[in-house]
Amino acid sequence: MKINLKKKRRPPRHFIPNILTLFNMFLGFLAIGLILNNHPIKAGVFIIIAGLFDVFDGKIARILGISSRFGMEFDSMADTVSFCVVPSILVYSLYVDGLPPLLGGFISFIPLMFGTIRLAKFNLDEEPGKPKSYTVGLTTPIATITLFSYLFFNHQIDGDFGDPRTALMLVAGLSFLMISPIHFAKFPLFSFKSGRTNTILLLAFIFSMIILAIWQGFILMPLIAVYIGWNIIHWLINPSLNDAPSEADI
């Protein structure tokens, strides 16, 4: 009688999404160091790239059919670093000078606090392998990139990082949106055969990337403002439509 001592090995592709998640976390870690060393613009570039890794890790996992609870939880840990800790450190480094230390620390803590609440809510609502066509509340990557877009915009126009009062109002607004019941459209599937809605969103994304490459810091903030504004208006006008399955899921 032969005993098979060989352990069943998982195929290498199983680790691909987790590697992308690790890159997301690593870029967030580097962004923290850049902010602390007075390089917030470079940190913002790293965070945008981290956001792309955050998009692709889940999509690749679903394409390969290897979505898992571990992957979802690991992704949340990476997002906590890149899109919760990083914006809090950015606010503390740039926008609370002159405030009492305790007050400045609390205000800086707000993105981390609301961001982690948002991530916890997402994990409760989302089932591995069964994605919805929307998210409830603004995602932490979009919220963080929005804050950095304000920094990019002002740095490109005036050479500074913007008015702290405006930045803190933006932080308050983004924090509310993260835990709000408003539905925001997810990143579209990379397919022109997944329904008309997905095709429109995919074309809009491609067009946005083209003009972003041309105008860079000038256009990122307006693009995000359009995305947030459109989703808020759409949810207010047609709240019941957001609960319907997407064409790609039917």
Can you name each region flagged by the protein language model?
Residues 30-46, 85-108, 149-167, 213-218:
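Helix-coil boundary and interhelical linker segments in multi-pass alpha-helical membrane proteins
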Residues 14-22, 63-122, 150:
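Multi-pass membrane catalytic core of lipid/isoprenoid biosynthesis enzymes
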Residues 59-68, 116-130, 179-188, 232-239:
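C-terminal ends of transmembrane helices
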Residues 18-25, 80-82, 194-205:
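Short hydrophobic alpha-helical membrane-embedded segments
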Residues 26, 52, 56, 60, ...:
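Active-site His/Glu-centered metal-binding helix of metallohydrolases
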Residues 1-55, 212, 223, 234-237, ...:
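Topogenic membrane-insertion module of multi-pass membrane proteins
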Residues 11-20, 27-34, 38-40, 45, ...:
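"…together with the soluble PPM/PP2C metallo-phosphatase catalytic core" -> "…together
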Residues 1-5, 132-250:
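C-terminal membrane-associated helical module and adjoining short loops/tails
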